[in-house]
Amino acid sequence: MKMVGRAWKFGDDISTDHITPGRYYHLRSNMPELAKHVMEDADPDFMKKFRPGDFIVAGKNFGMGSSREHAPLALKIAGVSAVIAKSFARIFYRNAINVGLPVLIADTDSIDSGDELEVDLGKGLVVNRTKGIEIRVKPIPEVMLKILHEGGLVSYVKKHGDIKI
């Protein structure tokens, strides 16, 4: 699975409240509306700059805070191709895989906002086309790659009946 888009960079400790601000929680049953507000508390102009297919890039502990699955789902519905970070909160990481949002662990120091990236999930590689460098990502376990390729856990189970680990 290859994806190309621009990077939008954030720092460490981006919480689920930064991703989906609590004041919009009443929209949780209307995910397309909630998705219009992703990252608003981290960057009020994010959705004005972002285009579907772009990537979110961050430092350590992305997705910390509450365990609500609305955060990764809203990112996916907004059109985020993948989140690339130095590390993720464990619950966010699993929720992202379960909703079909690729999450990649990599050194993000050489990526800046606006850089054009090419991500190859199968090869575990991020190419920063703007800077002409390759960044290896921590391999995604095979079962998780299969879930991502099906669009999430529910789609995977509907198609295959169960998960063989």
Curated annotation (Swiss-Prot):
Keywords from UniProt, A to Z, are: Amino-acid biosynthesis, Branched-chain amino acid biosynthesis, Leucine biosynthesis, Lyase
Q: In which pathway does it act?
A: Amino-acid biosynthesis; L-leucine biosynthesis; L-leucine from 3-methyl-2-oxobutanoate: step 2/4
At the top level of its lineage, which domain of life is listed?
Archaea
Q: Name one GO biological process term.
A: L-leucine biosynthetic process
GO MF annotations in UniProt: 3-isopropylmalate dehydratase activity
Q: What class of enzyme is it?
A: lyase
> Which chemical reaction does it catalyze?
(2R,3S)-3-isopropylmalate = (2S)-2-isopropylmalate
- Gene3D superfamilies recorded: Aconitase, domain 4
Q: What is its EC number?
A: 4.2.1.33
What do we know about how this protein assembles, alone or with others?
Heterodimer of LeuC and LeuD.
PANTHER family for this protein: 3-ISOPROPYLMALATE DEHYDRATASE SMALL SUBUNIT 1, 3-ISOPROPYLMALATE DEHYDRATASE SMALL SUBUNIT 2-RELATED-RELATED
Q: What family does the Swiss-Prot or TrEMBL record give for this protein? A: Belongs to the LeuD family. LeuD type 2 subfamily.
Please give the function described in this protein's UniProt entry: Catalyzes the isomerization between 2-isopropylmalate and 3-isopropylmalate, via the formation of 2-isopropylmaleate.
How is this protein named in the record?
3-isopropylmalate dehydratase small subunit 2
Which species is the source of this protein?
Archaeoglobus fulgidus (strain ATCC 49558 / DSM 4304 / JCM 9628 / NBRC 100126 / VC-16)
